[in-house]
Amino acid sequence: VPFTLKREFSGYHDTELHDCSSSASAIRKVLMNIPASPYLPKNISAQLSEQLPPGSLSIIQNEWNFSCPVEADDFSLLLKYRLLSEPHESLCKYQDVSEELSNRIIRNRNQFRSFGQFCTLLKTKELTYSRISRSLLHILLSITTEDMHAYQDNSCSYARILGFRKEHTDVLRAMKDHASIPIITKLGKSASLLSPEASRMLNQTSFASDLYESVISDKFGIPFTSEQQKQIIRV
């Protein structure tokens, strides 16, 4: 039976680093407060080496100022466009958007300054920051309650392979031959393998990836690569 382990030294939303086991919120705060730099500063690397597995820290160091850091406010203009284009009566169709939250969004959207600022503005005792942030992401990505019900009813409709080791090609081949669900390795060939609901889920996932890619492309000045263009990773 699954059970939770209480974190020692720091709380879930603690924003200060501790000697070890700091919260994700604290680690994000450190990363987001770093002044513009082409590389991750050595003192920050030293701090994070006590908080993160070596592999995770290595990824941050290698991707710094190339594809990270990315924060919610980087999606502010995209979200503002979506909120301005949505009529009041349509907001409630999105996952987690209640009538109360819809009303607050419409009443306050002219005060929108950034993703984070708007979450704080909308927050009440009944509507937490996390709930609002999640709801706004659903609006941004056009994820409706109807979508979620369809995905839940169809459970696991496919498996998309993102990468594999070259010496285990036989495992991938066996999966394709014997799996009870479609195994997707190329997006362009997925349409004929999937049900309408599974295709919709995969298309939404690809759209979210492309949206994220467009943000890092604009922020860091790197070429945009769509999800359709990305190749499976072989190591």
Question: At which residue positions do the language-model features occur?
Answer:
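Active-site cores that bind ATP or allylic diphosphates and position pyrophosphate for catalysis
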Residues: 1-235
